[in-house]
Regions:
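Conserved hydrolase catalytic core segment
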Residues: 162-202
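Conserved alpha/beta-hydrolase "acid-adjacent" motif
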Residues: 312-319
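Catalytic active-site module of serine/aspartate enzymes centered on a nucleophile-bearing elbow/loop
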Residues: 330-370
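Conserved acidic catalytic loop of the alpha/beta-hydrolase fold
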Residues: 144-164
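Alpha/beta-hydrolase-fold enzymes
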Residues: 186-270
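Catalytic-loop region of hydrolases
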Residues: 27-80, 90-91, 96, 367-370
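N-terminal cap/lid subdomain of alpha/beta-hydrolase-fold enzymes
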Residues: 63-132
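Short beta-strand/loop motif that positions the catalytic acidic residue
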Residues: 299, 305-307
Length: 370
């Protein structure tokens, strides 16, 4: 059964600070520096995608915090992989409502105690993506390819044979489920946030399909080989932040007709500044290979899944997730109730809401043991 958790009303202050997370162009203040903070690029030669296509050189950008700690056998026992959402990058975890709540002294992933790995997912940020120059000739990738690239980073570049935990939000949460299934003996604990272990369908698929079809049918798209950015699809782009925000938050932001129309135009402009049409198309369509439900029996890691009651992408009335999580031995599902301190799907940007569950998960597991 889902377990509701009442979180402090003070989180309403944090909610305002996190609103910009839905749009990369609305940059947050400069992030703090954490112990051992390092950025790097991992290059894979002749990366093979699951459909058979290859890329001569695939780049995966990543950030690490802290230092590896070795156990008596010489194995690293404090590595945690953090995975971001669809329209984000590793920078998602360094805003004021995330980084200090996660990596600061005494926090769940205190960078003086944990070795934290945060990659830019394939197709995003500093990692290889269509807008680098290949445009629509960039190989079609799915979540399976994204996870494969992450695994190569962790094992080949960083030399790790084990992860203490995989934690992800939205798309990153879905990929956390995939990690638990694909590499069941590699991970101690998994925390998927704001997602479900089922194929993209229903309203979740419909709004994604509307956006991708708007791009594909934009007369300026030119089959992905456009010389100037397509413009027409942008008028549907507000669907994205609308689905990320709660109804209460949107009503508060736009309580009148003029305010709502002004918000709409601001969303269109933010999309124009933030997104390349090909990159966005690939982001959304990469989710269509996601379907962990048939392989949930393979999961050995301790799982603590967290969703939010006012999340329009993962509606609370769809109770399948509680049943599916219950089918995984030792797994637990938490449904955080809606309140002053929640933002719908974007509550994932408020680490203060979900970090108590991360603390619980890490306490309930030990390195290389469950």
């Amino acid at each position: 059964m889902p377990i509701a958790h009442e979180h402090p009303r003070a989180l309403g202050v944090l909610a305002a600070a996190a609103l910009a997370a839905a749009w990369p162009a609305l940059a947050l203040s400069a992030p703090l520096a954490y112990p051992g903070e390092t950025e790097g690029d991992f290059v894979v030669e002749d990366f093979r995608f699951q459909d058979g296509e290859t890329l001569p050189s695939l780049r995966l950008h990543y950030t690490t915090l802290g230092m590896p700690r070795h156990d008596a056998a010489g194995e690293v026992d404090n590595a945690v992989l953090l995975l971001h959402g669809t329209s984000s990058t590793s920078k998602q975890y360094f805003g004021p409502t995330m980084g200090p709540e996660l990596f600061g002294p005494g926090q769940p992933l205190d960078a003086s105690r944990y070795y934290v790995i945060i990659p830019d997912g394939l197709g995003r940020g500093g990692s290889s993506k269509p807008s680098d120059g290949l445009h629509a000739r960039f190989p079609r990738y799915g979540y399976g390819d994204v996870v494969n690239a992450q695994h190569l980073l962790v094992t080949r570049k960083l030399g790790l044979g084990h992860l203490r935990a995989v934690v992800g939000t939205s798309m990153g949460g879905m990929q956390a489920w995939m990690w638990a299934e694909r590499y069941p003996d590699f991970v101690d604990a998994v925390m998927p946030i704001a997602c479900q272990p089922i194929a993209i369908s229903g309203r979740n698929l419909l709004f994604r399909h509307i956006l991708t079809q708007a791009i594909r049918n934009d007369p300026d798209w030119q089959e992905g080989e456009y010389r100037s950015p397509p413009r027409h699809w942008l008028y549907t782009a507000p669907l994205w932040p609308m689905m990320l925000e709660s109804a209460a938050r949107l009503q508060s932001e736009a309580p009148t007709r003029p305010a709502a129309l002004e918000l709409y135009h601001r969303m269109v402009e933010n999309a124009r500044r933030s997104y390349d049409a090909n990159d966005f198309l690939y982001w959304v369509e990469s989710s269509f290979d996601y379907d962990p439900q048939p392989d949930l029996a393979k999961v050995k890691a301790r799982v603590l899944a967290v969703n939010f009651a006012d999340d329009a992408i993962n509606p609370a009335e769809l109770t399948l997730i509680a049943k599916l999580v219950a089918s995984v031995p030792g797994a637990r599902f938490v449904l955080v109730p809606a309140g002053e301190g929640t933002l719908g799907h974007q509550t994932l940007s408020l680490a203060a809401v979900w970090k108590p569950y991360l603390e619980e998960l890490l306490r309930s597991t030990t390195p290389a043991g469950r």
